[in-house]
């Protein structure tokens, strides 16, 4: 039997990068996966890969995670089509790197909305279903930036540190409910995020999205009596 046979997962940011890798990995292990991202075309491509590979069922739901109503609709459609929600992975994220003096308040708002607030809204939206089931696992994808001082990333770091703190508190609030909450803290991952950034670390030294997917898989496949409430994953080459 596959590790996630019979499980239903919602993955945000599933169109590319880390979210895509996690969705593909979960489907390969038998999960039914609700794929959420803004791009309908990217979601269709990922859903097609899942079906071609013969993995679990895939439901592509174009979603703007900064829209509370869209998030509620995502959860409602997933629960309606698959009858339950066992796993939530919040992998949607964005970044704009600059010194605080050179940064733009509009970028602050975008990062706070996508990286922090949207993840909080997603968690709140799935909790009624998970609490009724008395089981579920939430994995919030933060960043090593939540724990390291990286020049040029003050606002990005604030959003990821906020997500880290939120996840730890939520884990305590739900400790005896059957719902587990973990936060995943990857270092530099080779994703399209770096395509437009000058001075990035060598791409071949970074983590791969599939590495992060393996870590997420570990977090959601532990037996019910165990929880990885915090997992840091770094490149072995000494870069962040």
Task: Pin down the residues of each PLM region.
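Conserved glycine-rich cofactor-binding loop
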Residues: 8, 15-16
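Conserved glycine-rich Rossmann-like NAD(P)H-binding loop of the short-chain dehydrogenase/reductase
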Residues: 29-45
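Substrate-binding pocket helix/loop in short-chain dehydrogenase/reductase
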Residues: 99-100, 107-112
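Alpha-helical segment proximal to the catalytic Tyr-Lys
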Residues: 128, 172-173
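Residue(s) in the substrate-gating loop at a strand-loop-helix junction
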Residues: 143
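C-terminal helical subdomain
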Residues: 176-179, 183-184, 191, 201-240
């Amino acid at each position: 039997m596959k590790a996630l046979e019979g499980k239903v997962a919602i993955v945000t940011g599933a169109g590319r990068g880390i979210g895509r890798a996690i969705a593909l990995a979960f489907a390969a292990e038998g999960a039914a996966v609700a794929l959420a991202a803004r791009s309908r075309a990217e979601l269709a491509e990922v859903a097609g890969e899942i079906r071609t590979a013969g993995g679990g069922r895939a439901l592509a739901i174009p979603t703007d995670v900064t829209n509370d109503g869209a998030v509620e609709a995502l959860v409602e459609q997933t629960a309606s089509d698959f009858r339950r929600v066992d796993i939530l992975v919040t992998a949607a994220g964005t970044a704009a790197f600059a010194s605080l003096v050179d940064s733009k308040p509009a970028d602050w708002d975008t990062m706070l909305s996508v990286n922090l607030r949207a993840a909080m809204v997603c968690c709140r939206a799935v909790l009624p279903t998970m609490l009724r089931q008395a089981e579920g696992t939430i994995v919030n994808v933060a960043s090593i930036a939540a724990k390291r001082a990286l020049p040029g990333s003050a606002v990005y770091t604030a959003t990821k540190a906020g997500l880290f703190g939120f996840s730890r508190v939520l884990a305590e609030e739900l400790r005896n409910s059957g719902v587990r909450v973990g936060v995943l803290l990857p270092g530099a991952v080779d994703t399209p995020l770096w395509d437009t950034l000058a001075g990035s670390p060598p791409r071949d030294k970074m983590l791969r999205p599939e590495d992060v997917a393996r870590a997420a898989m570990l977090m959601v496949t532990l037996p019910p009596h165990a929880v990885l409430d915090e997992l840091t994953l770094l490149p072995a080459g000494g870069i962040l």
